[in-house]
Amino acid sequence: MAGAITDQLRRYLHGRRRAAAHMGSDYDGLIADLEDFVLGGGKRLRPLFAYWGWHAVASREPDPDVLLLFSALELLHAWALVHDDLIDRSATRRGRPTAQLRYAALHRDRDWRGSPDQFGMSAAILLGDLAQVWADDIVSKVCQSALAPDAQRRVHRVWADIRNEVLGGQYLDIVAEASAAESIESAMNVATLKTACYTVSRPLQLGTAAAADRSDVAAIFEHFGADLGVAFQLRDDVLGVFGDPAVTGKPSGDDLKSGKRTVLVAEAVELADRSDPLAAKLLRTSIGTRLTDAQVRELRTVIEAVGARAAAESRIAALTQRALATLASAPINATAKAGLSELAMMAANRSA
């Protein structure tokens, strides 16, 4: 199914690129960059959750227009990633320089006027905006052409929730960084809004909304998705500190350098306060500063030594098991349960 989602994206993006040919080669280059970013990587998790949300309440396969609707989640994800890299000043994404760095390099290579860095940031903002606008266009088009009025209203409600929660979660994330928030509760709230809702809960509900009026199933997916989505984010937190850059495509320790207030970091500070005041001081004074590779390794050692990594793994396991227990009792068909169980294990235990 991931391949079918990619095919839908490819056809849509190629069509939009052809339709915009009259706008000239520079804009064509921006669209080509979006094509490359969307088609060149990603696990298609969000459209896959939408697909199984559909199958939870419908026995028939979704038609191509509905698959295109689910594919819009991948464009929304591209928007979030490009802008997240800007906010975090990240250098790499999926093993390549981030959009803002590539556009800054383009500016330098062509010896243009002004600041390469400012151009890079501006172009990356527009790249992300393009992904968001086209995601919205897909939803509007499919609702008008392929869904009954009641289904249209249900889908639009879920889509509005997705966008609001992603933006709200992202803002809370930067507030947490700026204020050096330390509580696990604060970090969990960010993880729920910024990641869990738009990665699992809302995609599942989008699929269900397109297929049928099943508020009972949507409510169950709210709980299932909250637990699994936070487990997904906690895995991301662990990979951000301990992951293999050759596999994740991002430098290990980026979250520590940017000062991201993840659950892993909050857990480390809380545990260090109890057992090792010197370690707690090191964490508080180092995270969010210009760290050398040696300092990243030292912080990684401290985080593991105080038990934060083990605590994160325990949380991931507990949340995943709770999500699977919720799924087991859900009034949905067995095929969807099996598909979602497999997808859940992959999401929580991935290495990239």
Curated annotation (Swiss-Prot):
Q: Where does isopentenyl diphosphate bind?
A: K43, R46, H77, R94
- Give the top-level enzyme category: transferase
Q: Which cofactor does it need?
A: Mg(2+)
Please write the reaction equations for the catalytic activity of this protein: isopentenyl diphosphate + dimethylallyl diphosphate = (2E)-geranyl diphosphate + diphosphate; isopentenyl diphosphate + (2E)-geranyl diphosphate = (2E,6E)-farnesyl diphosphate + diphosphate
Which residues does the annotation say bind Mg(2+) 1? D84, D88
Which GO terms are recorded in the biological process aspect for this UniProt protein?
Answer: geranyl diphosphate biosynthetic process; isoprenoid biosynthetic process
Which cysteine-cysteine pairs are annotated as disulfide bonds in the entry?
none
Under PROSITE patterns, the record lists: POLYPRENYL_SYNTHASE_1 (PS00723), POLYPRENYL_SYNTHASE_2 (PS00444)
Q: Which GO terms describe its molecular function?
A: (2E,6E)-farnesyl diphosphate synthase activity; dimethylallyltranstransferase activity; metal ion binding; prenyltransferase activity
As recorded in UniProt, its EC number(s) are 2.5.1.10, 2.5.1.1
Entry's cofactor comment: Binds 2 Mg(2+) ions per subunit.
- Alphabetically list the UniProt keywords: Lipid biosynthesis, Lipid metabolism, Magnesium, Metal-binding, Transferase
Renumbered ranges of motif DDXXD motif? 84-88, 236-240
Q: Which InterPro entries match?
A: FPP_synthase, Isoprenoid_synthase_dom_sf, Polyprenyl_synt, Polyprenyl_synt_CS
Which residues take part in binding Mg(2+) 2?
D84, D88
Pathways involved: Isoprenoid biosynthesis; geranyl diphosphate biosynthesis; geranyl diphosphate from dimethylallyl diphosphate and isopentenyl diphosphate: step 1/1; Isoprenoid biosynthesis; farnesyl diphosphate biosynthesis; farnesyl diphosphate from geranyl diphosphate and isopentenyl diphosphate
Q: What does this protein do?
A: Catalyzes the sequential condensations of isopentenyl pyrophosphate (IPP) with dimethylallyl diphosphate (DMAPP) to yield geranyl diphosphate (GPP) and with GPP to yield (2E,6E)-farnesyl diphosphate (E,E-FPP).
Per the record, the similarity remark reads: Belongs to the FPP/GGPP synthase family.
Annotated domain remarks = Contains two aspartate-rich DDxxD motifs, designated as FARM (the first aspartate-rich motif) and SARM (the second aspartate-rich motif).
Q: Which PANTHER family match?
A: GERANYLGERANYL PYROPHOSPHATE SYNTHASE, SHORT CHAIN ISOPRENYL DIPHOSPHATE SYNTHASE
- Write the protein's name: (2E,6E)-farnesyl diphosphate synthase
